[in-house]
Curated annotation (Swiss-Prot):
The keyword Transmembrane helix does not apply. It comes from Talaromyces marneffei (strain ATCC 18224 / CBS 334.59 / QM 7333). GO terms for cellular component: cytoplasm. It is an enzyme of class 6 (ligase). It is found in: Cytoplasm. Substrate binds at residues 294-300. It comes from the Eukaryota. Its EC number is 6.3.4.4. Mg(2+) binds at residues 12, 39. It catalyses: IMP + L-aspartate + GTP = N(6)-(1,2-dicarboxyethyl)-AMP + GDP + phosphate + 2 H(+). This is Adenylosuccinate synthetase. HAMAP family: Adenylosucc_synth.
Amino acid sequence: MVTIVLGSQWGDEGKGKITDYLSQDATLCCRAAGGHNAGHTIVHDSVTYDFHILPSGLVSPKCINLIGAGTVVHIPSFFKELGALAEKGLVDADKRIFISDRAHVCFDLHSVVDGLEEAKLGGRKVGTTGKGIGPCYSDKAARRGVRVGEILDEEVFERKLRNLHSGYRNRFGELAYDVEEEINRFKEYRQKLKPYIIDQLPFLQKYKNDDRILVEGANALLLDLDHGTYPYVTSSSTGLGGAIQGLSINPTKIKNIIGVVKAYTTRVGSGPFPTEQLNEFGEKLQVTGREFGVTTGRKRRCGWFDLVLCRYSLAVNHYTALNLTKLDILDDFDEIKVAVAYKLPDGTRLESSYPADAGVIEKLEVEYVTLPGWKSNTMGLTKYEDLPENARKYVEYIEKGLDGVPIKWIGTGPAREHLIIR
């Protein structure tokens, strides 16, 4: 059976921690989509690990890991990340990681183009990570991309990369990029990569009767290309559909769909954010929550918990259980607000649907309920009954507001053991 972990808001919810926890019993951990624009931080045995393209299951010594067909892989980052894990003691990580030959290659060329495209947008920029993810997925959709498996065929690889470069030069003129230099780098990568590249389908068939398969979502539902706050989204399918598509999962084998929700809301980059607090509350959340992007280092925008957004996320992703993270960050608030409805400019009231038009979202009014804070330390608590009464009421209010989907896990700190299991 398969357990899928998905982000329910705009990313940075803390998916890595619950994935790390669940991977202790997993046989296989897979990334289905996205690239090295994602960022997860895991604290285990007082060691902090940062993950971008690699699955978090590598921290578990018995877990095999797969970067699936729906991903885009920046090869230098892949090896850099593996090296960083080895330096921190995960010396066998390189023996437990594989890449689908159908995944696409994200080149330095894509990063250069990403910057040029953002610059052209000016004030309407998306606020990408600048890692080249969008241009890489664009090349994939236009059927001119380079797949990981094609790296092994030197002639095909070099021809396709030169064609990509030529196409972008025709569009942008001279680029701050040397295609021959990149080709030479891949001469070294070619042999190094060979042990990692596999045909995904027969690889996964070996696990078809295994009940301990874990899928680690990247980014989050509101960044999904189809269901997110378009155009302020990433370029892949970040929801349930993307997990199934990117890994050829049998839907009847899915046992758990875990939605990870932060106890407040954050967003990196541009785009609408109805509950954003551009005041002392937002600043307090940012500072107390240490809200800086793992990938970019940018400050995250912060705001109150949004039930409307999460109800919409639930309707798209069909969560069977929830993981509420970073509850301890709210410890010092006198009052805590929760968004329960939106009021559109025409007077329409929304409780569980999310407007498709980013311009409409920017203009809506938010209806809040105000709940009392608990003003006591919850960091490191591991028993639900030990939470202050108002903290329990906050958890149960969110649970009730999300159709009673159980909040099975509650994060009370950064470490693996800082977790309440209900």
